[in-house]
């Protein structure tokens, strides 16, 4: 017999049903398809053949550029996420204070994050141009340098520039996530700490950081996913040149699939990247949760 109690029991699931269907269609189903394709033979024309086991994975791992790409991806994620997190906390602490023009500074800070990554990378490409780049022009006009500097003289320096642009566009996201956590902290905690003789660093380590940890955890996990999957910066600035020396996993599998037409290994590489990303994000969340629980 139908009763209001039964309706209340199922009502939350009915409200969630549209979201669940969208996630299933656009997230879960494509993931299942990619996993299936990674174990299938795929021709250069994209024709799907039979089951080949782990052959695609073997070919992907044995490719000459695989080790370089994996190391680049590691340093790309570590440097961009790590440095942007530190700088984001610094900017959040600054913006949490009251000062004249704070709203203007906040608007300026959010601009790099809100602008298209392709535009950002293109602008930075122009700034560091050897012949007519703005950076060389400014330094020459100020008399700081006597002749133009080649800011992209090696692939190592180009990779550093990629990381720098990644940090530049990511800092605002971290800053505003942490700022939201800072603004939820009760001011009386700082007043009590001041009365007890606590200094700036004592308040930071014992009050601020522990209380903004939930916001920081969310921003870090999202940042890892966002940076790992970032395609426009690397592709716009270098396209992985020379010889995949500045490639990350995302740009490499794109080139592998659409330029070299090796769709099987590219699919396997995408699965490897997905599993690595899940492992890193999961490990970070578990570590943080254990610290919060005091285990």
Across the structure, where does each feature detected by a protein language model lie?
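A structural signal for multi-pass alpha-helical bundles of membrane permease subunits
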Residues: 4-295
């Amino acid at each position: 017999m139908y009763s209001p109690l039964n309706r209340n029991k199922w009502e939350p699931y009915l409200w969630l049903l549209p979201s669940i269907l969208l996630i299933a269609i656009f997230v879960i189903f494509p993931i299942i398809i990619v996993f299936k394709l990674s174990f299938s033979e795929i021709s250069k024309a994209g024709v799907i053949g039979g089951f080949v086991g782990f052959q695609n994975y073997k070919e992907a791992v044995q490719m000459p550029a695989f080790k370089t790409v994996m190391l680049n991806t590691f340093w790309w994620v570590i440097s961009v996420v790590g440095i942007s997190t530190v700088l984001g906390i610094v900017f959040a602490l600054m913006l949490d204070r009251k000062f004249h023009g704070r709203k203007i500074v906040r608007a300026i800070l959010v601009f790099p994050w809100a602008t298209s990554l392709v535009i950002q990378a293109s602008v930075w490409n122009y700034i560091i141009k050897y012949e007519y780049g703005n950076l060389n022009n400014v330094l020459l006009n100020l008399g700081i340098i006597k002749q133009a500097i080649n800011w992209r003289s090696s692939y190592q320096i180009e990779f550093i520039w990629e990381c720098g642009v990644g940090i530049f566009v990511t800092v605002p996201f971290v800053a505003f996530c942490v700022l939201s956590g800072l603004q939820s902290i009760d001011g009386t905690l700082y007043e009590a700490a001041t009365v007890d003789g606590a200094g700036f660093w004592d308040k930071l380590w014992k009050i601020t950081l522990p209380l903004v940890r939930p916001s920081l955890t969310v921003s870090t996990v999202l940042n890892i996913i966002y940076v790992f999957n970032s395609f426009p910066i690397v592709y716009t600035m270098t396209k992985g040149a020379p010889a995949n020396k500045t490639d990350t996993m995302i740009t490499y599998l794109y080139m592998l699939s659409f330029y070299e037409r090796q769709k099987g290994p590219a699919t396997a590489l995408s699965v490897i990247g997905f599993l690595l990303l899940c492992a890193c994000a999961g490990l970070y969340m578990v570590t943080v949760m254990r610290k919060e629980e005091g285990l």
